[in-house]
Amino acid sequence: ARDAMLRFPIDDLVDEQRCHDLLLRVLHPDGLRCPRGHALPPDQAPHDRHRAPILDYRCRECGAVYNLFTGSIWCRSRLRCSKIVLMLRGIAQGVPTIHLAEELGLDRSHLLRRRHQIQSLIEEGLFSLDPIRSDHRS
């Protein structure tokens, strides 16, 4: 009966911009900054928009190019914001890796590596899933 289970394309039902905004709050609680710590000016236009809503910016101070994922475990990730938010939500809720991987269409071993990275960061006090748990807006 396991194969007969109804699967919803949940990541297609989640708003990318809202997921981006949540990740921005989680990954950069003090605002987006370049890798050298220079703040993103509120009036600065993106350097590159090809992955919107993930926008690349070029720092006006040092010239470094950065985005939402720079300096995080998601650096160089090609996953959509919605997929990452749903992954974090599943981990926060204790969903078994195999079920989460099936639901999100991800490789189980890749998801397991990410889960271990996230759990290590939480243990070191460098990351919290609280904003994911408490973000109940739909």
PLM segments and residue spans:
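Residue-level recognition of single "structural anchor" positions
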Residues: 1-138
